[in-house]
Amino acid sequence: MDESLQSEELLDPAKKFTYVAPAGLDDTYVVFVIGETTRWDHMGMLGYERDTTPKLSKEKNLVAFRGESCDTATKLSLRCMFVREGGTMNNPGRTLKEQNVFAVMKELGFTSELFAMQSEVWFYDNVNANNFAFREQIGSEKRNQGKAVDDMLLVPEMKASLDRFPKGKHLVILHTKGSHYLYSQRYPRSF
């Protein structure tokens, strides 16, 4: 991987562009879920003919995008998924040219925490979160002993994060294992 650009050398969209938030957003909470291998064209809430997202469709204030990945590997997709189009170099390593949206949100006054069922530590570190924990850390916590190490362990992490940051602008990023092989061994039939 070409990692020749340091974070201080990256374009900072927060400095180049202006965003003025509407009044009344002092206490704003954003939960951002990175859902692995979920295709927008198979989600009922985004127009798929079958109702594949009945619970998500009922959520208030939910925003879903018809996004596409720039690559098939998580490591490379994470590089370009959270920057503007053209924010990475067109090379095999997808070298970043600008800061990702999460680093920009931090500059705009958001606190943030990231919890993941994967181990892309290089990416989590570049988010500039106040705290992050990944699969091996979360799964080894005493409170999780005897539990299946699956995406559902992210729910109590999210709740605890919201409790730790009860006021202000706060972002919680959840990186799921999603539909990666072998789905049937990671989720109960009831799911």
Identify the function of each model-found stretch.
Residues 1-32, 37-191:
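Active-site-proximal alpha/beta segments of enzymes that process anionic O-linked groups
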